[in-house]
Amino acid sequence: MDAFQSILKFFLNQKTAIGYSFMALLTVGSERLFSLVAFKCPCSVENTAYGLVFLFAPAWVLLILGFFLNNKAWRLFTGCCMNPKKIFPRRRCCRFFYVLGHIILSSLVAPVMWLSVALLNGTFYECAMSGTRSTRLLEMICKGKPKECWEELHKVSCGKSSMAAMESEEVRLSLQAQSQILGWCLICSASFLSLLTTCYARCRSKVSYLQLSFWKTYAQREKEQLENKLLECANKLSERNLKCFFENKKPDPFPMPSFGAWEAASELHSFHQDREHYSTLHKVVDDGMEQTPQEEETTMILVGTAQSL
């Protein structure tokens, strides 16, 4: 039992890495499925459009899904049309762009994975480049090749070119090599950017490493208990209302947070150095509806916590 609990604790502690690993495997599987089942290069002048659509359209869809599934985005934008001060509060206009940048970076993970895998495979890029009409690109691809390469490059990816089989294969391998080089460049650039943003966020942190660890633990526990409490209160309220409806009697008072409390607890957390609140809910409970001076607050985002609800 102790061994099982240790293993379970390890996986819970590494759930972010496990989640990204699962996303990577899912991306690889999806790309292979697209390549084998759905992708059929037309071997015509439409190669470029067809290849680029298969390369970038899934990445765009994944980006949109990333926004849809990011609870922090909905927490930021819910009610903003009715009250623009929610996203552009007084003296903290930059806060919106800071949070939005974090949301965009989080949503870019899946699209970058797709583009990296697709470029490393090379199928979509090969089809797209074989349909190019750019003189500069044709000079680069068909350098040292017969004139058939210029005229029938769009047929190379299907093996229908009148060029010698060896020369046609050389062109295909060259296009695949270019695709893989771009794929590795994208992976290296994304990894370096991720490292830079993480280092910058840690260097700008207003709390120590141990306090940050405590903050993460607290926020995770609050998230779990909040979900349970919401379900429990919803069950009790619905049970009370149904019972009173069918028994035709007046309901007993049911204590619930006020509208203002719901609004305050739904805001993104702003860390205050003098008053250590580890979440917006923590701040609302301690201060009630009293607002902390805006100019003394520092926006800090804790990834994967109750702030993502």
From Swiss-Prot:
The keyword Membrane applies. GO terms for cellular component: membrane. It is found in: Membrane. One of its GO terms (biological process) is monoatomic ion transmembrane transport. The chain crosses the membrane at residues 16-37, 46-70, 100-129, 175-200. Residues 1-15, 71-99, 201-309 are cytoplasmic. InterPro entries: CALHM. It is a multi-pass membrane protein. Pfam families: Ca_hom_mod. Its main location: membrane. Belongs to the CALHM family. Oligomerizes to form undecameric cone-shaped channels. May assemble to form large pore channels with gating and ion conductance likely regulated by membrane lipids. This is Calcium homeostasis modulator protein 5. The gene is Calhm5.
